[in-house]
Every structure is written in C-alpha cells, then in structure tokens.
Regions:
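Bacterial Sec-dependent N-terminal signal peptides
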Residues: 1-25, 39
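Interaction-mediating elements
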Residues: 23-145
Length: 145
C-alpha cells in the first residue's frame, strides 16, 4: 500500500510539473487588447515573427519577437514588462522622463537597448553594456557592468 501511495504521489508531482509551464505559439489577435494596441503604437513598422503565450501555474505572460530581433514581453493584462532590441534603441516614449534626463546627462551618446519594468524598479541596459537600475521615483539605485 505504501508503494502504491508513493508512486501515485510521484506521478502527481511529475504531472503538475509538466503542466505547470507551457509555451505555445499564438497569433497576434490572441494577445490582450492592450498588447495589440502597444504593438500598433510603437512597432507597426516591424514584422512579427513569433507570438507566444507562456502559462505558468499562477500567471500568463506573452512574448512577441520581431524580424529584426526586437522582443517585447507582456504580463497577463497585456501591459509591457520588457522591451529589448538587437539593433537600434527602445522607443523613447517608453522611458520615464526622469530616467531619460539622467541618461542624457550622464551617458550622452548612449542609447537604451533594453528596458524592464517591475513594481518598484526599472532596469535599463545601455548600448555600452551598462545596466542601470532606478527606483519607482526615477532615482538611480544600482549600476552593473
């Protein structure tokens, strides 16, 4: 009886692990409306090569990859959480004004090639490789090479 219970528990754990995270390709039309609007506003000139939905146990996220290597990640509501570019810069309108001002003053000539926003902080990666972390008020709190 103990062996049967043990194998049953192992099966359940493996099954939950296998189902816990699943990436699946979807169409742009299956994105939340906010994500569709974001893409139309900032990336209408780019060709989408892949749209995928990642479903974890507790949340859904979406990834959109463009032909030029630009990637955008969205949360389950369709709000962007990360934008990264292989060539060029992140659209300036996505960068909070305080962060733009700081970067143009301290790192003139550098472009932002990645921006990631979280609840209490925003991280940006510059074209020179520096990664800057700002608090929610736009104050620099960390620099990583």
């Amino acid at each position: 009886m103990k062996k049967i219970l043990f194998f049953l528990m192992c099966f359940i754990v493996l099954h939950i692990s296998a189902c816990a995270s699943a990436d699946k390709p979807i169409t742009k039309e299956n994105l939340p409306q906010a994500a569709q609007t974001f893409i139309q506003t900032y990336f209408s000139d780019k060709t989408i090569t892949l749209v995928k939905q990642d479903t974890d146990v507790a949340r859904k996220t979406y990834d959109v990859v463009f032909a030029d290597g630009t990637e955008v990640e969205f949360n389950g509501k369709g709000l962007w959480t990360e934008v990264s570019t292989k060539t060029g810069a992140v659209p300036q309108d996505l960068v909070p004004e305080t962060i733009r001002t700081f970067i143009s003053g301290k790192y003139a000539g550098q472009t932002i090639c990645r921006i990631e926003r979280e609840r209490a902080k925003t991280e940006v990666k510059l074209s020179n490789g520096l990664e800057l972390t700002f608090n929610k008020d736009g104050r620099l709190i960390d620099i990583d090479n």
